[in-house]
């Protein structure tokens, strides 16, 4: 057996996510808004940059050399202007503050006189600060408390919280207790939203009485003590009891507690406050929230009077499958806007087969008109100019070559005068300033590095920020992925994906293939951007090892028409499109070796990886599943019921890897974190038990202290995955190489959170 050279692993390690910012300087701009959004600063490499869009100015936030010299004098430490010992600043007028060398400092930018100072009162990680930064709320003993930041005075806003019926908590799996402890915090921030004037708090009382309990054992607690039992509340599909959210408004001055006079909201997945399914009106005069039943086949908009608790239902839409306020469930706010002081509603719907905007009269629920239309989809509402009656948004499907690329558009609320503000054919990833005056635009494709600018609502570039430099990335042997189009297994539907050629590619060679799926339905596996996203970075590394790496968004994933996204309803994780894509690609690429195909996935992708091996054993010879959802009937109710269907209506055996384990023919590595609160370890244990009973060979790696993201263990996971693929697809012995553990720095954590 040949030995793979260690340089392959060294090259692959350089392409892991935590190295990305150093390899692609200028690839990402993370604005930190100041002056209400009128200006912002960001880090460009090791430099701090200040941007004033109204003035069209991009300048250094301060003189780095003078500040470094002043800090060195004041602290007695060596300070390099090209590597300042802080990653964040606070700017106010002509001063800048920062923390360094165990102290807090203020520098006057007129004189560069530096002095020690007390840090400004700020909210801790476990708190949620008011808009005016005067107060912060936090949880204590099942209740919600408030702290005055100026002097630290604390008082309780509720007093009747109890275990299983407490305030401002999300479902247990979302609390990420293991991960949060690793990061040094006691808990997640409360599920709470402040009124615009900072006087009241919208939250919910969380009712988890009678919810199913699940258990995990922490083998090695942080204190080194004996194994510890962890019990969490975790409802399964079809359970009678699921977590419920009882909306409540709290007045921090008077202590008034106003409870919504409506049924509590099913909350199996995440808090409606955290997902912005419940929010304050801009003037604080009302709370609006969305609700839907557990099966998700209707969606309603309600108005809550924060003074009385009275609830009025404004709109309800029903459908044959799930009705959604957007197709992307991870991080994006619902596409619902209240206009005209609450008299009109801008509403997202897929009723005509595509995701579009509709205008309603709030008082009567009457449809005033369809705002957008056509065989394309609205991706995000960016801004509504109520004076000019115009809505700005991103749309996907207007670029013929790639229906996933986003275009910035505007249209009148009467449905007329559609215009594209970005007239090119690249993707536009947009972030709107808090004051709504402009937007930061990152324009790229999967093969074209990002150009980041600030634009006004006429589409004009106000300030150029960054041109991503890929010189260092190219030096690693990286080549841009190929964006491809193939047919789905039905032979009709177009699918899109990316293909990474192996490093040192020779078209006369034959290369093993690694499929890297994620089926959604709440997120895409492939991004249309140059940055491949958190699910895509390891694909670049595996190409460095010598694999052809493929990723494709099959039917059932978001971003296209309603029929496309509904294709997986009742059949989650089906891999027929993955298999069809690989076979089509290989027909015109003889260097792809279909006799050596592997598949690697995590979470829902882990389920699909195993399902691919079970349903297509003639194609997939090796697979790796990390924290796979192998038994959907044991996943949290909110996800399974919404995307697969209710038990009794949907066939859960159809999507069970455990039920079809007898089909396994290839080499399989199962990985799971022993403390995973999201996809509980029993998913992998059940599959392993079934395979062992069937006398099937299977490798298994359980990392006792790991949660769903495996933070702190990634270096080991990467090596073990790579070793497995090298052995079983290359028929080679992997080198003796240990990957350096990842550091939880701000850039790395921002990629996840």
What is the predicted role of each segment?
Residues 1-432, 437-448, 454-455, 733-735, ...:
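Beta-propeller folds
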Residues 262, 277, 284, 290, ...:
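Serine-hydrolase catalytic core recognition
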């Amino acid at each position: 057996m040949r030995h793979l050279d260690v340089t392959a692993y060294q090259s692959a390690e350089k392409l892991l996510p935590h190295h990305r910012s150093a390899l692609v300087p200028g690839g990402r701009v993370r604005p930190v808004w100041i002056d209400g959004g009128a200006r912002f600063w960001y880090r460009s490499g090791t430099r701090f940059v200040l941007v004033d869009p109204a003035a069209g100015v991009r300048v250094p936030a301060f003189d780095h050399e003078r500040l470094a010299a002043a800090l060195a004098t004041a602290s007695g430490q060596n300070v390099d202007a090209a590597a300042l010992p802080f990653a964040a600043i606070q700017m106010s007028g002509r001063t800048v503050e920062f923390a360094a060398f165990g102290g807090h400092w203020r520098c006057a930018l007129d004189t560069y006189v530096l002095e020690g100072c007390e840090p400004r009162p700020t909210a801790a990680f476990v708190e949620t600060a008011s808009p005016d930064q005067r107060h912060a709320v936090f949880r204590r003993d099942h209740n919600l408390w408030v702290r005055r930041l100026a002097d630290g005075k604390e008082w309780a806003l509720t007093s009747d919280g109890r275990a299983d019926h407490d305030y401002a908590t999300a479902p247990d799996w979302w609390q990420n207790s293991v991960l949060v402890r690793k990061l040094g915090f006691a808990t997640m921030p409360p599920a709470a939203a402040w009124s615009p004037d900072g006087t009241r708090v919208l939250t919910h009382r969380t009712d988890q009485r009678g919810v199913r309990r699940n258990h995990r054992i922490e083998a090695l607690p942080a204190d080194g003590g004996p194994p510890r039992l962890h019990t969490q509340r975790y409802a399964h599909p079809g359970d009678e009891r699921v977590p419920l959210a009882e909306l409540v408004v709290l007045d921090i001055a008077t202590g008034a507690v106003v409870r919504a006079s409506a049924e509590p909201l099913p909350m199996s997945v995440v808090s409606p406050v955290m997902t912005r399914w419940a929010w304050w009106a801009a003037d604080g005069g009302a709370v609006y929230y969305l609700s839907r039943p557990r099966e998700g086949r209707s969606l309603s908009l309600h108005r809550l009077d924060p003074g009385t608790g009275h609830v009025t239902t404004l709109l309800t839409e029903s459908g044959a499958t799930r009705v959604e306020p957007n197709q992307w469930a991870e991080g994006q706010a619902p596409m619902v806007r209240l206009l005209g002081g609450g008299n009109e509603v801008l509403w997202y719907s897929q009723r005509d087969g595509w995701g579009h905007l509709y205008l309603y009269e709030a008082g009567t629920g009457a449809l005033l008109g369809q705002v957008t239309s056509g065989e394309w989809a609205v991706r995000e509402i960016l801004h509504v100019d109520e004076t000019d009656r115009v809505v700005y948004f991103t749309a996907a499907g207007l670029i013929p070559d790639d229906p996933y690329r986003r275009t910035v558009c505007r249209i009148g609320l009467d449905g007329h005068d559609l215009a594209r503000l970005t007239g090119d054919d690249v993707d536009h990833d947009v972030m709107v300033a808090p004051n709504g005056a402009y937007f930061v635009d990152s324009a790229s494709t999967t093969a074209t590095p990002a150009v980041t600018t600030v634009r006004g609502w006429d589409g004009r570039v106000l300030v150029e920020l960054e041109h991503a430099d890929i010189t260092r990335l190219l030096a690693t042997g990286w080549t841009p992925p190929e964006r491809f189009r193939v047919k789905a297994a039905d032979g009709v539907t177009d699918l899109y994906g990316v293909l990474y050629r192996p490093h040192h590619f020779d078209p006369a060679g034959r290369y093993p293939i690694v499929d890297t799926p994620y089926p959604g339905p709440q997120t895409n596996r492939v991004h249309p951007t140059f940055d491949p996203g958190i699910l895509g970075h390891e694909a670049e590394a595996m190409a460095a090892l010598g694999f052809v790496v493929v990723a494709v968004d099959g039917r059932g994933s978001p971003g296209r028409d309603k029929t496309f996204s509904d294709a997986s309803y009742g059949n989650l994780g089906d891999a027929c499109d993955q298999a069809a894509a690989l076979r089509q690609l290989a027909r015109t690429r003889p260097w792809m070796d279909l006799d050596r195909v592997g598949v690697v996935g995590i979470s829902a992708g882990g389920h699909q990886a195993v399902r691919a091996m079970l349903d297509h054993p003639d194609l997939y010879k090796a697979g790796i599943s990390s924290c796979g959802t192998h038994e959907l009937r044991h996943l949290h109710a909110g996800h399974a019921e919404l995307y697969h269907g209710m038990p009794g209506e949907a066939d859960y055996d159809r999507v069970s890897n455990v039920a079809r384990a007898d089909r396994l023919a290839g080499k399989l590595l199962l990985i799971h974190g022993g403390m995973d609160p999201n996809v509980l370890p029993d998913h992998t244990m059940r599959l392993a038990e079934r395979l062992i009973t069937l006398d099937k060979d299977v490798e298994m790696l359980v990392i006792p202290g790991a949660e769903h993201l495996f933070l702190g263990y990634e270096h080991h996971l990467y090596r073990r995955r790579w070793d497995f693929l090298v052995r079983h697809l290359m028929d080679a012995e992997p080198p003796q190489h240990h990957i350096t553990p990842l550091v939880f720095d701000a850039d790395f954590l921002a990629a996840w959170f």
